[in-house]
Amino acid sequence: HVHLVFVTRYRRQIFDYDATEKLRTYFSNVCADFEAELVEMDGEPDHVHLLINYPPKLAISSLVNSLKGVSGRLLRRDRPDIAVRYYYKGVLWSPGYFASSCGGAPISVIRQYIEQQQTPGQVENRALYPRPEGWGFTAHRIKSAI
């Protein structure tokens, strides 16, 4: 499993509930194309978290490039209101991404953390969701081509 985080360009507050649900569909379809599984996905107005189960032969960088590229194009097509206001030179995502191997923490803990992200459009108190216990794994910030 890998935990990925993608941030919007300039950390712009872009995603509402509808956009987040569209992204979930796009990400799930891309994962299926790579014979991977989107286990969990959630986020906030300026970033998304994904938990993906992927085959060992798959290069994470290839998956990330496709996830970011496809989601950016499809969201621009399906939500022109977002594209007009927030896309900078046709780009939705910041160039880098966060990727972390999930071998050091139980998948249930990581899944719980992602589920507890405050989805745009939901009214929840973030103080109710402290960082879960057992949150210990190796993290790498990697710059992508997109």
Q: Each PLM stretch: what is its role?
A:
Residues H1-I146:
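Basic nucleic-acid-binding interfaces
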